[in-house]
C-alpha cells in the first residue's frame, strides 16, 4: 500500500492528524469534513495514495465498486434522508481545472436540504 508522507489525507489515515472517523476497512477510509457545506458532509478516500481519478487503472475496479456501494450506506448512517425524497450528493474533483485542492483521490459525500446551493 502506497502512502505519500507529504499528503494530509495520508497523514489522517495513518492517525498522525486527528479526524472524526466515519468508517475504515483495509481499502477505504471516511472522515468528517473540517469545513462542512451540509448537515452531513464527510470524505470517502482510498487508504492507499492515489493522486486523482485520472490515475485510476483496471486494478482499482474492486475497491472503487465497493466505495460506490458503501457511500449510500454511510450517507444514511450519518443522517441523510432516504431516497427518493431525501438523498445525498457525491463530488469528486479531478485536477487543478476540476477544482481538486488535495492531491489524494476523495469524494465529498453531502446531504441535507440542497446545501450546495449556498454558492
Label each region the model flagged.
Residues 1-119:
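HIT superfamily nucleotide-processing domains
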